[in-house]
A protein has these predicted regions:
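PRPP-associated nucleotide enzymes
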Residues: 1-157
Length: 157
């Protein structure tokens, strides 16, 4: 499912504008915080698509039934640019497992490259919901390589 967050009127547009602004980009702390905020907003939007199951909760007055996320989530990122975005997702999916991929471009010429995966840390993905986050999407090649590597090491999500 594709959900383009900046096509709707919401606060995320402010954070995206600041990420793209050449003057704001110079403020490293603000840049990282905005990526984290975008991760948090993305987590909220993603949560609408996940599986839920009823859970009984004891309140001070009585038992109450609450719908809670039933998916087992793994949040994965491509190091290092994705770390603030990853943290934003974890702020909401705080019981999620983590996966990390270290990848880089290996150039054969000025215009040709392939993605090399250097390192991976990944739990089993079998039967789990994988959220692969990377803010540095240009060609999409790193994202594809990361996904294929994660599945090769952790199984099919």
């Amino acid at each position: 499912m594709l959900h383009i967050l900046d096509k709707q009127k919401s606060i995320i547009n402010k954070f995206l504008a600041e990420l793209r602004d050449i003057n704001v980009q110079k403020d490293s702390m603000r840049f990282r915080r905005n990526l984290e905020r975008i991760g948090e907003i993305s987590a909220y939007e993603l949560s609408k698509t996940l599986g839920y199951a009823p859970k009984s909760v004891t309140t001070p007055l009585a038992e109450a039934e609450v719908q809670c996320i039933s998916d087992n989530i793994v949040v994965a990122t491509i190091l290092r640019a994705g770390l603030p975005l990853h943290q934003g997702l974890l702020n909401y999916f705080d019981d999620a497992e983590n996966a990390f991929v270290s990848a880089y471009r290996s150039y054969s010429s000025e215009s040709e490259f392939e993605i090399k995966v250097e390192y991976i840390a990944c739990p089993s993905l079998e039967g789990k919901t994988l959220i692969l986050c990377d803010p540095m999407l240009a060609s999409g090649a790193s994202m594809v390589a990361a996904y294929e590597t994660l599945c090769a090491h952790g199984g099919k999500p």
